[in-house]
UniProtKB/Swiss-Prot annotation:
GO CC terms, sorted: plasma membrane-derived thylakoid membrane
Name of the protein in its database record: Photosystem I assembly protein Ycf3
HAMAP family, alphabetized: Ycf3 (MF_00439)
Keywords: Membrane, Photosynthesis, Repeat, Thylakoid, TPR repeat
Organism, as annotated: Prochlorococcus marinus (strain MIT 9211)
InterPro entries: PSI_Ycf3_assembly, TPR-like_helical_dom_sf, TPR_rpt, Ycf3/AcsC/BcsC/TPR_MFPF
Cellular compartment(s): Cellular thylakoid membrane
Entry keyword annotation includes Membrane: yes
Acetylation in keyword set: no
Amino acid sequence: MPSSNNKDNFLDKAFTVIAEGIVKMMPIAAKEKQAYIYYREGFAAQNNGDYSEALENYEESLKLEENPVDRGETLKNMAIIYMSNGDEDRALETYVKALDQNPKQPSCLKNMGLIYEKRGRSAQQRGLQDESDIWFDKAADVWTKAVRLYPGGYLDIENWLKTTGRSKIDVYL
């Protein structure tokens, strides 16, 4: 019986073949097709944990991609990598760029809030209550926006907003 890993590998390869066929048939310019290919390669590398290769492919995709929604998605994935690598400042900058391209990405706002909330907890542990409140307020601001974009999708965040008294909205749905 094949292992789960073999099944996943087969599915990845099958998806890649199908996606390549679709891209070839799509009635779009060669530049846009190449941008998508770089994006897809970056996404595959990211899923395999090869973050440097993923970032290289995402950078190439951004050079070619003109669609703001697609650019926003690429930037969001880059920010996730920066966040995973512990480069929170760069992640925040990149999330802002992603939102500039496509403001309807609640996951960007959610992840920005995670960074702010983490910084708030850190300041709180060091006894810096004023600084902690600033970070928690920033988290509340972006999380409120995320909840408005994706009602019911972030129940843990809705609960945090309510229990900390930072909820700016009465009804989330």
